[in-house]
Structures are given as C-alpha cells and as structure tokens.
Amino acid sequence: MEVQLTNRQQHILWATVRHYIATAEPVGSKALVEEYDLGVSSATIRNVMGVLEKSGLLYQPHASAGRVPSDSGYRIYVDQLITPSLRSRSVSQTDATRTETLGREIEVALQKHLQWEDRSLETLLQGAAQILATLSGCISLITMPQTTTALLRHLQLVQIEAGRIMLIVVTDGYETHSKLMDLSPIPEETQRDSEVIDRELQIVSNFLNTHLRGRSLLELANLNWSELDQEFQRYGEFLKNSVAELTRRTLAPTATQIMVRGVSEVLRQPEFSQLQQVQTIIHLLEEEQDQLWRLIFEEPEPEDIGKSRVTVRIGAENPLEPIRTCTLISSNYRRGSIPVGSVGVLGPTRLDYESAIAVVASAADYLSEAFSYFNP
C-alpha cells in the first residue's frame, strides 16, 4: 500500500535518512533541530517521527534509541524525496550540487582512461571498476560485455553431404557459430546434383555477404528475408528459420565475468560487523557470480531499448539472501541501443543514494561511449 506523506512528514523523513546516512547512529529530534532548517520544534519532530514509525518508514533499534530508516523509508526517500527543492533545505548547501559534481568527477576520470595508449576494453573496464568503487564508497560490479551486438563479418553455406548443408557465421570479433541444416525443402532433382548445389550455395553466400555484412546479429534474427533477391528465394524458408534460430541462440544472454572492486573497504562498515554475513557476501561475489549476474543484467522491454535506466534494489527487495540487508544499484551499458553489460554498486542500505545513483548513471553512459569507441 502506497504511503501518502504530508510535506512536513516528507521533510522530516528526508532529514532523518540524510542524518543516518552521514552518522550511522540512530537519529533523535534534537539532532534534526540542530542540523537541519526544518522550521519546527523538537517536540513536533518527535511527534512526526512517531507517525513515520507507525507507518513502517522508521524504527527504533531499541527503546532508548533514536530512529533509523526501514527499507520502506529508504524506498520513499529514493522514489519521492531526492529532489533539488528538498536537498536545498539542508543547512549544508553543498548537498544541492553533489550529484552534478560527482557526475563530472567520474566523467573526467573515465575520460582519462579513454585516452590511454593501451586501448584494451578489458583494461578500461578494470579501471572503471576501481574508479566506481572509489567515488561511490561501495563495492563496484562491472560485467564483461555480451556478444549480443556482434556484427556479421562473413557467412558461408557449405554442403556437408547429400541433403545437408552447414551455415557458418563469423562475427567481427572472429567468433564462429555454425548450424547443420536439412535441405529437404529443396526439390529432390536438385539435391541429387552436388555440383549444382555447391554453385548455388556459393551464389547465395556471396549475395548474403554483400547485403548483410556489417549488420548486427540482432538485425539478422529479425530480418525480413523476403526483401532479398530471387537468387535467395529458392533457399528462403529454411535459411530464414535456420539463421533466426542460430542468431537467437548466439544472442541469448549468458553470464559473463563480473569485475569486483572495493570489497575490503565496504565490509569494514558497521553494518558488516558479523563475520558470517561478511563470509556469505564474499562467497556470493567470488563463487556465485552467475546468480549475481542474473540480478544486475536486465534485458529491457522492447519499448525501453536504448533508454538509460538505473535500478535501485533496497534490502529485502533483493532476491539473493546474502544481500537482503544491502542496496544494489545498477544500470546497463550499451552498444548503440542494445545492452551488452552492466555496471553497479553494492553497499549497506545506509548509503548515499544521490551520489551512488549519479555515479552509476555516469559510469554506464561512459562505458556505452567507450564500447562504441572500441567496437565502432
């Protein structure tokens, strides 16, 4: 059920979250009066905090303590309260420009990596992961890219035996994919003449290379084959189905290595004081990367392809048990409009959401630019 807050409740929830993020200590009304220009008395703040607690947005760790945000409180903070007008209510006016400043910092840092003489994409991603961990103060996660946007370099149809041919596809990264196909749709009298088949397959191969070289495999999977010329038409139906199956099989996202940086610093924070919790998180990062990859690499809906989107999962919103007390912020980086990898940060729910979201968004945009640079 969606919680409707008054302006005063919003401001006090915002200040409580900000103060707890900064101090890691339960927040009392006196601290908010001293640190934030809320324009109300300490008694009023206590009353409002009590209402927020009853709504499930704050809670008391123990009876004599102040209050801390719940997962639901953080969710409202992220979805509704991170706005310039609310940030400007802080005594410290630097909060109002922190997002823009951090965005520029990561842009400058990543631009420096883009100018390296060693223009290896893997080297760039390693550097980006370290920068992301440093600027966010979180564990950084960057997945190695998918081959979903590989371009067709060469296509060849080869007769293997009577009635069977092999389709061979070579991508711009020199990866080879093949599929064995049955020639049963072709008239029997043609199948019996092996030389005729060889000549026709070469003609079709040449024709397809001329018209399709340089296209992405995604385009091939969705190609309107009926637009191609007459030389192709006699082989049309089975090639259409076979190429579509081959390219879709190649395009299916598969878990890739996740580059992880910043673990030791984050795990020193008070939220990770329990050794068993630390061990389960490290095990996930090192031994269960497939599960984590499926969580941070999101295939967009067709209407969202090409759009930048940052996903924030807070606490129990994470389906993986080891990180159900953590926040995971992630976004895809793209080649053109197609997502090929993900960038993210993992930290306690008590993290600087404004900064972390800005850093992840900037990193994803720059990795998209870099991927196009290294793979024009």
Curated annotation (Swiss-Prot):
Question: Please, which domain of life does this record's source organism belong to?
Answer: Bacteria
Asked if the Swiss-Prot or TrEMBL record annotates the protein with the keyword Repressor, the reply is yes
Q: Which GO terms describe its biological process?
A: negative regulation of DNA-templated transcription
Gene Ontology terms, MF aspect:
DNA binding
Alphabetically sorted, this entry's keywords are: Repressor, Stress response, Transcription, Transcription regulation
**Is Kinase among this UniProt entry's keywords?**
no
Q: What PANTHER family does its record include?
A: HEAT-INDUCIBLE TRANSCRIPTION REPRESSOR HRCA
- State the family it belongs to: Belongs to the HrcA family.
What function does this protein fulfil? Negative regulator of class I heat shock genes (grpE-dnaK-dnaJ and groELS operons). Prevents heat-shock induction of these operons.
What is the recorded name of this protein?
Heat-inducible transcription repressor HrcA
The species this protein belongs to is Nostoc punctiforme (strain ATCC 29133 / PCC 73102)
